[in-house]
Amino acid sequence: MALNLRKNHQILKIINDALIDLPAPSNISTWWNFGSLLGLCLITQIITGLLLAMHYTADTNLAFSSVAHMCRDVQFGWLIRNLHANGASFFFICIYLHIGRGIYYGSYLNKETWNIGVILLLTLMATAFVGYVLPWGQMSFWGATVITNLFSAIPYIGQTLVEWAWGGFSVDNPTLTRFFALHFLLPFVIVGLTLVHLTFLHETGSNNPLGIPSDCDKIPFHPYYTIKDALGFVLMLSLLVSLALFSPNLLGDPENFTPANPLVTPPHIKPEWYFLFAYAILRSIPNKLGGVLALAASILVLFLMPLLHTSKLRSMTFRPLSQILFWTLVANVLILTWVGSQPVEHPFIIIGQLASFTYFAIILILFPLAAALENKLLKL
């Protein structure tokens, strides 16, 4: 009998085990679509980014003009640039929903998968940050100056570290060159980490909305979830293309249409929308080192999620108190995002400080307490 190539060929076998014959829970909802959507975002960003890199010049005198040239003179250059810029926003929308799903359904109990996921988030944030500097507009330049300057808060080695990162005594040509190199490199690091993320996921199998073992009721990934993912692809690409065609600058900062000028500071320096929640936490502490530590903690706190799980139930599906806290946390992050976009004045300062405190209080104190209380109430 002829061998089935799909199941016996060394390389096809890996693809088959990951995308075709993979046993998947029969009841995973649309919240489980975001992993594949993130994969699609990554592929889209790498393709559009590669096409943009062919026309971009990493030089302070030419960067801004090269981006303008791309949009004016390159075939469909305007579309490629708009897809790439807005693709980053979709990437972050998907990753935040993906993380929210993980917290709600207790997926963080797959510790290796979760920890690699947090490292992926950090790498994605680094990639987006260095990428935002490349067009060399006003917000690119001042954003780079402000954020890299935060490293100077590190005791003893801070200033040396910043000058080493800049390649000089201010953000200038060497900074732009190395940021371009990093922006080209990091997406491939993300691809590698994604493969590790999937390898660990396929060791344990996916979690499901009930948070119970699903070994007794598995279905093949193909055709059930391939078609389900395909629907997600169509919907997300439709939204991305609509945004890129109808309102490409909706999420950008008008300040970035002005070429970088070290002598003129913009009235309000702020990052792209997807960093605003962390930026609000940074600003809410009136001390440089304290702010930097809070900024780092706002993301690194995710590493603690598996350690803070006190409930006997994995998922929040049957835990109403934890659900209330979860949606309060979501509202809290939205408030932080809004505060981060506002100037540093009353009442935004105090709102930001309260929201920052609540953010850490919910994750570090209230989630474990509520879970322990629910154990008691449910007599578990």
UniProtKB/Swiss-Prot annotation:
Q: Which InterPro entries match?
A: Cyt_b/b6_C, Cyt_b/b6_C_sf, Cyt_b/b6_N, Cytb/b6-like_sf, Cytochrome_b, Cytochrome_b_C_euk/bac, Cytochrome_b_N_euk/bac, Di-haem_cyt_TM
- What subcellular compartments does it reside in? Mitochondrion inner membrane
Give yes or no: UniProt keyword Iron: yes
> At which positions is a ubiquinone bound?
H202
Free-text comment on the cofactor? Binds 2 heme b groups non-covalently.
A Gene Ontology cellular-component term: mitochondrial inner membrane
What are the protein's UniProt keywords? Electron transport, Heme, Iron, Membrane, Metal-binding, Mitochondrion, Mitochondrion inner membrane, Respiratory chain, Transmembrane, Transmembrane helix, Transport, Ubiquinone
Q: Which PANTHER family match?
A: CYTOCHROME B (PTHR19271:SF16)
Quaternary structure and interacting proteins, as annotated: The cytochrome bc1 complex contains 11 subunits: 3 respiratory subunits (MT-CYB, CYC1 and UQCRFS1), 2 core proteins (UQCRC1 and UQCRC2) and 6 low-molecular weight proteins (UQCRH/QCR6, UQCRB/QCR7, UQCRQ/QCR8, UQCR10/QCR9, UQCR11/QCR10 and a cleavage product of UQCRFS1). This cytochrome bc1 complex then forms a dimer.
Summarizing the function annotation, the protein's role is: Component of the ubiquinol-cytochrome c reductase complex (complex III or cytochrome b-c1 complex) that is part of the mitochondrial respiratory chain. The b-c1 complex mediates electron transfer from ubiquinol to cytochrome c. Contributes to the generation of a proton gradient across the mitochondrial membrane that is then used for ATP synthesis.
Name used for this protein in its record:
Cytochrome b
Question: What is the scientific name of the source organism?
Answer: Passerina cyanea
